[in-house]
């Protein structure tokens, strides 16, 4: 994107016909366009279908643009997404989705047009209001340049993810256990053999909200063990207000954090977040100006909010 002028025009629309809902949005910029359309159909109570089509030209650009897609920005992507949700029995819910996408232009780690698929299945069991258990499986296939070929050889990579989570929230106390497993397989250039890398993690989090004092405390601990960066794992944590924090880890080590929030009254809020990552497979962390001598990395975040109300 270059020049001394810029514009971006957009329009959104919605149409409802019985149990069918059509929602869409279109935008055009100085050089490209972006289209997103969604069809949602409610078959019966507890049963629904969702179809999403997206078409983002490779030369479309917008300020702070965010939309549905495989990439992080509405740019250089076409795709169809189909999802279905069903609740055939009491306390049970099933969800399945399939995303077929393509990139008409080159992008990070791929020097030509490419395509891929992303499928997911999740089964959720909730026998009572404060207890939930779910099992999630996800499969993704993409294409990537083979290292050392200068972008002349492109082969597929396969990513399998499995997650099991148990959540118990009896009143002011909540407890959540999560186990993740990753398997990354890449086809090598010689003989088309597969190279497999694995990773797993176990995360335990607990939270408590005091009834007689405006204080909420949560702690979380994670152990991770992965073969390399491709088999890295993600562990979401509570962060500051209006922010999301989902760090990634690879190698072997522990991650623990504490989150304390105090709402003094309707006007003042004070929040402290402390976290530390301790690696067991290295003596230094990072490189260059971010190099840390040692195997531990500590982060501290403090937020103070003042709300003005009439």
Task: State each model region's role.
Residues 2-310:
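Exposed, low-structure sequence patches enriched in small/polar residues
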């Amino acid at each position: 994107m270059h020049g001394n002028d810029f514009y971006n025009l957009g329009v959104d629309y919605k149409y409802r016909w019985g149990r069918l809902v059509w929602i869409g949005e279109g935008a055009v910029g100085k050089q490209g366009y972006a289209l997103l359309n969604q069809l949602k159909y409610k078959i019966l109570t507890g049963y629904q279908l969702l179809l999403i089509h997206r078409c983002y030209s490779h030369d479309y650009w917008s300020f702070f643009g965010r939309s549905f897609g495989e990439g992080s920005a509405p740019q250089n992507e076409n795709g169809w997404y189909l999802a279905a949700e069903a609740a055939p029995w009491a306390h049970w819910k099933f969800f399945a989705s399939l995303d077929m996408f393509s990139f008409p232009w080159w992008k990070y780690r791929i020097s030509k047009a490419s395509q891929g698929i992303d499928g997911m299945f999740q089964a959720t069991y909730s026998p009572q209001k404060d207890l939930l258990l779910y099992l999630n499986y996800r499969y993704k296939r993409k294409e990537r340049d083979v290292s050392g070929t200068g972008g002349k050889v492109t082969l597929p990579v396969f990513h399998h993810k499995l997650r099991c989570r148990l959540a118990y929230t009896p009143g002011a106390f909540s407890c959540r256990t999560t186990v993740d497993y990753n398997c990354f397989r890449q086809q090598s250039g010689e003989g088309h053999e597969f190279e497999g890398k694995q990773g797993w993690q176990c995360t335990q989090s607990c939270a408590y909200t005091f009834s007689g004092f405006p204080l909420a405390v949560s702690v979380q601990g994670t152990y991770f063990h992965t073969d390399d960066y491709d088999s890295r794992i993600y562990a979401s944590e509570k962060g500051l207000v209006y922010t999301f924090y989902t760090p990634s880890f690879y190698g072997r080590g522990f991650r623990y954090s504490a989150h304390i929030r105090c709402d003094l009254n309707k006007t003042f809020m004070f929040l402290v977040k402390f976290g530390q990552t301790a690696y067991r497979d290295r003596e230094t962390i990072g490189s260059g100006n971010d190099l840390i001598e040692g195997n531990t990395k500590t982060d501290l975040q403090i937020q103070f909010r003042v709300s003005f109300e009439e």
